[in-house]
């Protein structure tokens, strides 16, 4: 690692700001959504998450090498946990949204926590595959649109909406 005491320090120097951007952009979208009036949330859920996904996609393509290092080479550092962190944030957001649906008189059936974790993890892995495999940006944009339609329909079905 030369100038750095550890892989962790090296990765902090190379990818730290990019990891923080992706993580913080996702958190910001979750917070913006949670701060909306309850009645408005079902109407704009897909819009806010879509904007966030495209923002992260474009950012990752602008910083492709660094983002690929996070996704493919960060084992043994805190950066390897990016997807797991995003999954936990999404799980919490899903539970908060279920509370909103209950408040609106549109309760969601119980979702098995293991299934919920598997589906959300799969969703993020699917998204990040676009970056890992360096899909042409136009293709990646189309794939994100299709993935959003697929996952939105699935979640709406599971949530009884």
Stretches found by the model and what they are:
Residues 2-5, 9-35, 47, 51-55, ...:
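Alpha-helical structural segments
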Residues 70-87, 139-155:
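C-terminal/domain-terminus segments
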Residues 51-62, 76-103, 113-121:
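Amphipathic alpha-helical packing segments from all-alpha helical-bundle domains
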């Amino acid at each position: 690692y030369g100038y750095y005491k550890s892989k962790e320090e090296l990765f902090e120097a190379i990818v730290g700001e990019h990891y923080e951007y992706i993580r913080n952009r996702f958190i910001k979208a979750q917070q913006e959504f949670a701060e909306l009036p309850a009645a408005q949330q079902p109407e704009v859920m897909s819009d806010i998450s879509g904007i966030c996904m495209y923002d992260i996609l474009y950012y990752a393509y602008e910083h492709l090498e660094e983002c690929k290092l996070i996704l493919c080479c960060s084992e043994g550092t805190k950066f390897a946990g990016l997807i797991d962190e995003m999954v936990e944030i999404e799980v919490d957001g899903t539970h908060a949204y279920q509370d909103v649906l209950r408040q609106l008189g549109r309760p969601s059936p119980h979702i098995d926590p293991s299934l919920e974790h598997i589906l959300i993890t799969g969703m993020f892995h699917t998204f990040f595959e676009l970056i890992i495999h360096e899909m042409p940006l136009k293709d990646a944009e189309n794939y994100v649109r299709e993935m959003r339609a697929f996952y939105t329909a699935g979640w709406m079905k599971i949530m009884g909406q």
